[in-house]
């Protein structure tokens, strides 16, 4: 199997979608997981104010609201968690996203003290973190907090990973990539926008430039700059359309380089890396 065939098979992106149907598919998927695992009662999600967490949060709240209505069990709850490192530059967008999704519970946990303490402890041990490595510390601290909240509310942590992100491995291993359930996987970036439009989301939340915003020295660095390829090109590639050869090569290189992120810890029986 050629590399592109393998990528398209792995990422499961349809050439065209019906936004309403995909919304229902994600909501029913989330509900089915709770129905199968009756000891689970909540979803927990970190909210940044970007497209992916806005969409995921709205879908998670819809699923939880429907579970309450269907079962009469008020223990079903959605926890939307703001996790700033100090002060977030686009805090107004996060508030707009929260107002759009109308979560049952809003929590704020500032991760700055925890991250800075880890950085200082490592420095004391002779390990000076680069700005990039510190950025990954932020992502992992955010996930640690979400799992702590989930542990106290019979919950699972919902991920925002979609296929345009998964193909490039553009997330932190065991950070924002370390979640329990990903309702957006199979969608690319433009398809996620289509779902938000269908849901009546404020336009500025899905038109803003995507950024991981993890590095102190490169605040709000656009994803497309970091990747060296645009989301339109990634989306076209995943839909089986023609893309420039250099863009295809970059996408395929990212896919190969980040293969380890799409697997749990490697065992002696794994051979994808050989």
From Swiss-Prot:
Origin species: Listeria monocytogenes serotype 4a (strain HCC23)
Signal peptide stretch: none
Protein's pathway: Cofactor biosynthesis; NAD(+) biosynthesis; NAD(+) from deamido-NAD(+) (ammonia route): step 1/1
Keywords: ATP-binding, Ligase, Magnesium, Metal-binding, NAD, Nucleotide-binding
Gene Ontology terms: cellular component: cytoplasm
Molecular function, one GO term: metal ion binding
Protein name: NH(3)-dependent NAD(+) synthetase
The protein's Enzyme Commission number: 6.3.1.5
Record carries keyword Transcription regulation: no
Superkingdom of source: Bacteria
GO biological process: NAD biosynthetic process
Role played: Catalyzes the ATP-dependent amidation of deamido-NAD to form NAD. Uses ammonia as a nitrogen source.
Record-listed ATP binding positions: 46-53, 160, 189, 211
């Amino acid at each position: 199997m050629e590399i592109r065939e393998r990528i398209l098979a792995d990422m499961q992106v349809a050439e065209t979608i019906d936004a309403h149907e995909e919304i229902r598919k994600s909501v029913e998927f989330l509900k089915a997981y709770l129905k199968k695992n009756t000891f689970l009662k909540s979803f927990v999600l970190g909210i940044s104010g970007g497209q992916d967490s806005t969409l995921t949060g709205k879908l998670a709240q819809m699923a939880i609201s429907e579970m309450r209505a269907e079962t009469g069990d008020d223990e079903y709850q959605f926890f939307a968690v703001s996790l700033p490192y100090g002060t977030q530059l686009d805090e107004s967008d996060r508030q707009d996203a929260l107002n759009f999704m109308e979560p049952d519970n809003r929590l704020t946990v500032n991760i700055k003290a925890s991250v800075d303490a880890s950085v200082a402890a490592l420095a004391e041990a002779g390990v000076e973190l680069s700005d990039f490595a510190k950025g990954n510390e932020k992502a992992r601290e955010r996930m640690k907090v979400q799992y702590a909240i989930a542990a106290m509310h019979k919950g699972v942590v919902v991920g925002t990973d979609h296929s345009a992100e998964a193909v490039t491995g553009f997330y932190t291993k065991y950070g924002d990539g370390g979640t329990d359930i990903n309702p957006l996987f199979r969608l690319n970036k433009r398809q996620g926008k289509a779902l938000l439009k269908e849901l009546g989301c404020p336009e500025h939340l899905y038109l803003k430039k995507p950024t991981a915003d993890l590095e102190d020295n490169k605040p709000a660095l656009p994803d497309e700059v970091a990747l060296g390829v645009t989301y339109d090109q990634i989306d076209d590639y995943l839909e089986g359309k023609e893309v420039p050869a250099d863009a295809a090569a970059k996408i395929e290189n990212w896919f190969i380089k980040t293969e380890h992120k799409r697997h749990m810890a490697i065992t002696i029986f794994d051979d994808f890396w050989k």
